[in-house]
Amino acid sequence: MITELHGIDIRENEPLKHYTYTKVGGPADFLAFPRNHYELSRIVAYANKENMPWLVLGNASNLIVRDGGIRGFVIMFDKLNAVHLNGYTLKAEAGANLIETTKIAKFHSLTGFEFACGIPGSIGGAVFMNAGAYGGEISHIFLSAKVLTPSGEIKTISARDMAFGYRHSAIQETGDIVISAKFALKPGNYDTISQEMNRLNHLRQLKQPLEFPSCGSVFKRPPGHFAGQLIMEANLKGHRIGGVEVSEKHAGFMINVADGTAKDYEDLIAYVIETVENHSGVKLEPEVRIIGENL
């Protein structure tokens, strides 16, 4: 118990595998669940005062936490999840579930968010990664974000300052953490929006191994190629290290089939990169983030 942070939900030495989509990850020294921006500011101020590292995990979807865990504070935004509409502008806190947010837009017959209807994760993580699928991406609808700087200051960042690129945003370099974001949507037809979301979800279910824990798409799309196709051509479908294997359903995914570890994921990623480069001459670049310490 940290007396200066009394009243905030903080768990000591908490295994992160219980919170990640991959079902791997060692313990966080302190895992915190702030309920509002005030509690978040208190946590960050305390960590900075004590020279303790801190980071935000979001919904921990496109992420691998190493088996040794993470030192200092890990902050999760599960309780910072409010979504509000003001006309055609949707504002969501960073912890809002991305899929549920697209459903809110649909309910109000607002179009623009359909592409994200099956992407796991949080609003904050989606902005950080410029998440996208089926021709759409966050940058197409993004207006602005309120962020927390590493020093604990809260400021607003515009779409221009985000400098979005493919699976990239400026805050990947600055260390700023999204705490809320605004998106510009357009009036649409409920049935049309619903049909498009059903179509995209059907495609996702057909092509992706949703029945297993995974970190989502492992590699960025190399120019002129598809990562999954290159992996398949290198005869790596079903290749397994420890409890993690390249999905038979979609070679761009790695799934946890038998109590795999973060080391299994890292070893398999390295093996796939090397094998594909030897086979095709293309060096794959991971899209998934890998953080934390090894055992």
From Swiss-Prot:
UniProt catalytic activity: UDP-N-acetyl-alpha-D-muramate + NADP(+) = UDP-N-acetyl-3-O-(1-carboxyvinyl)-alpha-D-glucosamine + NADPH + H(+)
Protein's organism: Streptococcus pyogenes serotype M12 (strain MGAS2096)
Pathway info: Cell wall biogenesis; peptidoglycan biosynthesis
Coiled coil: none
Name of a matching Pfam family: FAD_binding_4
EC code: 1.3.1.98
Keywords tagged on the record: Cell cycle, Cell division, Cell shape, Cell wall biogenesis/degradation, Cytoplasm, FAD, Flavoprotein, NADP, Oxidoreductase, Peptidoglycan synthesis
Compartments (UniProt record): Cytoplasm
Lineage: Bacteria, Bacillati, Bacillota, Bacilli, Lactobacillales
Domain FAD-binding PCMH-type: 23-188
InterPro entries in the record: FAD-bd_PCMH, FAD-bd_PCMH-like_sf, FAD-bd_PCMH_sub1, FAD-bd_PCMH_sub2, MurB, MurB_C, MurB_C_sf, Oxid_FAD_bind_N
Gene Ontology biological process terms from the UniProt entry: cell division; cell wall organization; peptidoglycan biosynthetic process; regulation of cell shape
Family: Belongs to the MurB family.
One GO cellular component term: cytosol
Active-site residues annotated for this sequence: 167, 217, 287
Gene3D superfamilies cross-referenced by the UniProt entry: 3.30.465.10, UDP-N-acetylenolpyruvoylglucosamine reductase, C-terminal domain, Uridine Diphospho-n-acetylenolpyruvylglucosamine Reductase, domain 2
Gene: murB
Cofactor dependence: FAD
UniProt-recorded name of the protein: UDP-N-acetylenolpyruvoylglucosamine reductase
A GO molecular function held by the record: UDP-N-acetylmuramate dehydrogenase activity
Function in brief: Cell wall formation.
Main location: cytoplasm
